[in-house]
Regions:
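Structural motif
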Residues: 16, 110-112, 141, 286, ...
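Short Gly/Thr/Asp-enriched flexible loops that form oxyanion-binding sites at enzyme active sites
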Residues: 121-131, 340, 344
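Short, conserved loop/helix-junction motifs that constitute active-site signature segments
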Residues: 131-136, 298, 321-323, 344-349
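Histidine/lysine/aspartate-rich catalytic loop segments that bind and position anionic ligands
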Residues: 293, 298-321, 326
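Electropositive, gly/pro-rich neighborhoods at or near active sites that engage anionic ligands
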Residues: 2-54, 67-68, 171-292, 388, ...
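Helix-adjacent hinge/juxtasegments
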Residues: 65-106
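C-terminal functional extensions of proteins
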Residues: 154-173, 353-409
C-alpha cells in the first residue's frame, strides 16, 4: 500500500468581517470567536481590540490584546478634543506586531488581526505581518470597514472571503473539515484496554469507557493488524488517525477511540430514535444511509446509499438533494469515511441529525451545522463484544446499552 500524506483541512481564504461605521460590535465578535476556538484547543495567535471608554479628552481608550498571552498594548493617542487626526498610535500598533510575528513563527491554526484600516491600507501598521501570514498559508481573520473594502481587495489580490458580522458566518468560514481536529482536541488521554474488530463494527475500550464505529466496507477481506499494534496505546494517540489518516480502517478505529471519550456512561439525553426527529416535516427529508426500519419511520424520505437499491439514490446525489431540504439524517459512518464535511456544507439551512452508534455525543459538533446527535452508550461491554465478534448489526445493540440523543438548544 502506498504511503499517503496526512489528511489536513483545506486552506482558507483570508476572512474579512465587513462592517459599517463603528467597529465595537465586530471587535467583540472577533474576541468571542477566537476565545471559543482557544477553549476548544486550537492554537490561535494575533491580536483583538478592546475598548474601555473615555480617557481624558479621547473618545475611547483602545488596546490590542495578544490572544495567546493576554498581554495588552495601548494604541490610543490623546490628541485632544478638537483633533481631527487618527487617534490610533502607530508606535503602539508596531509594538503589538510582535504577537503576530510569534504566531506566524509557531504556525498557529489561526491568526486574528483586529482590523485592516487606514494604517494597513497605506502599507503600515500590521500590513507586513498580514502579508507574511497569507504567504505562509496560515488562516487569517480580520475586520474591514466598508470604506477600506477596495483597499483590502487590492491588498489580497481578491483572494479573500468577505464575511457578514455574525458568529454563524465565522463558523461557516472556519469550515466543516476542522471538526475532526476539534473532536481530537477534546480527548483526554487514557490507557486503551482492548480494540475489537468485527465484520461490521469496531469497539475501543478503556477501563471506564467504550466507543464504537462502523467498520468500513473497504477494509473487508484485508488482513487485520495484529493486536499488539495497539498494545500500550493511549486513547489520544489511537484517536489521532480520525483526524489525519486516509486509511479506512485506521480512521474508523480512530473514530471509535473518539467515541470512547465522548460516549461515556455519564452522558444523558433523550432516548428517541434519531429518525423520529424528522417525523411530520412538511418539506423534503434526505437520509444518508439505509437505516433499519427507515421505510416505516420515514416512508417519503429521499434515501442516498453507497450501493443504492430500487428507489434510492447513489452517493453522488448528496450535493443535488441536500440543498433546499428541510431535514437531513446523516449516518455516523460519514465521519469515518470523510464525507461528513461536504454533506454538512450541502445541508446548510436544513435541520441536520448525525445518527448511529458511531456518533460522538458532544456539543462540539453543533457549531459545524449539526442540530441533533443520536448516538449510543455501551453498558454491557462483554455482551456487546460478543455481538460484534459474531458479525452482528446495530439492531442487536439495544440490549447492551442505551441510545442517547442530544440537541443544540
Amino acid at each position: 500500500m502506498p504511503t499517503l500524506r496526512h489528511a489536513v483541512p483545506p486552506p482558507l481564504r483570508p476572512g474579512a468581517v465587513i462592517h459599517g461605521p463603528g467597529s465595537l460590535a465586530v471587535d467583540d465578535l472577533l474576541d468571542r470567536f477566537t476565545a471559543e476556538l482557544r477553549r476548544r484547543g486550537f492554537r490561535v495567535g494575533g491580536v483583538v481590540q478592546r475598548n474601555y471608554g473615555a480617557l481624558d479628552d479621547c473618545a475611547d481608550r483602545m488596546e490590542l490584546v495578544d490572544v495567546a498571552t493576554g498581554k495588552a498594548f495601548n494604541i490610543s493617542q490623546n490628541l485632544g478634543r478638537e483633533s481631527q487626526s487618527c487617534r490610533v498610535d502607530p508606535a503602539g500598533v508596531a509594538d503589538a506586531s510582535q504577537a503576530l510575528r510569534r504566531a506566524i513563527e509557531e504556525r498557529a491554526d489561526l491568526l486574528v488581526v483586529n482590523k485592516f484600516a487606514g494604517l494597513e491600507a497605506h502599507g503600515k501598521g500590521l500590513a507586513d505581518e498580514l502579508l507574511s501570514a497569507i504567504a505562509e498559508g496560515i488562516p487569517v481573520l480580520t475586520s474591514v470597514g466598508s470604506r477600506y473594502l477596495n483597499e483590502w481587495q487590492s491588498f489580497t489580490g481578491g483572494f479573500t472571503a468577505l464575511l457578514s458580522p455574525d458568529e454563524d458566518a465565522l463558523w461557516r468560514w472556519w469550515g466543516t473539515h476542522r471538526l475532526y481536529d476539534d473532536l481530537l482536541h477534546g480527548v483526554e488521554d487514557a490507557p486503551v484496554r482492548r480494540v475489537t474488530i468485527g465484520a461490521k463494527w469496531i469497539m475501543v475500550e478503556t477501563d471506564g469507557t467504550v466507543g464504537l464505529a462502523a467498520r468500513p466496507s473497504a477494509s473487508l477481506g484485508a488482513d487485520l493488524p495484529p493486536p499488539e499494534r495497539w498494545a500500550g496505546a493511549g486513547l489520544k494517540a489511537l484517536a489521532l488517525p480520525a483526524a489525519r489518516s486516509w486509511d479506512p480502517l485506521e480512521t474508523a478505529v480512530g473514530v471509535a477511540a473518539l467515541n470512547a471519550h465522548y460516549n461515556h456512561p455519564g452522558v444523558t439525553g433523550d432516548a428517541a430514535n434519531g429518525l423520529d426527529l424528522f417525523t411530520g416535516m412538511d418539506g423534503r427529508v434526505v437520509v444518508i444511509g439505509a437505516f433499519p426500519q427507515l421505510a416505516k419511520r420515514l416512508p417519503n424520505a429521499q434515501v442516498i446509499e453507497m450501493k443504492p437499491r430500487d428507489d434510492e439514490y447513489p452517493e453522488a446525489a448528496g450535493e443535488w438533494l441536500l440543498p433546499g431540504a428541510e431535514g437531513a439524517a446523516i449516518t455516523s459512518s460519514s465521519l469515518a469515511n470523510r464525507t461528513l464535511p461536504r454533506l454538512l456544507s450541502a445541508s446548510t439551512g436544513a435541520r441536520v441529525a448525525l445518527v448511529g452508534p458511531g456518533t460522538p455525543l458532544t456539543g462540539r459538533l453543533f457549531r459545524y451545522g449539526v442540530d441533533s446527535l443520536a448516538g449510543f452508550v455501551v453498558e454491557d461491554r462483554e455482551a456487546l463484544r460478543r455481538v460484534i465478534l459474531d458479525g452482528g448489526s446495530s439492531q442487536a445493540f439495544h440490549r447492551h446499552g442505551r441510545f442517547v440523543t442530544l440537541h443544540n438548544t
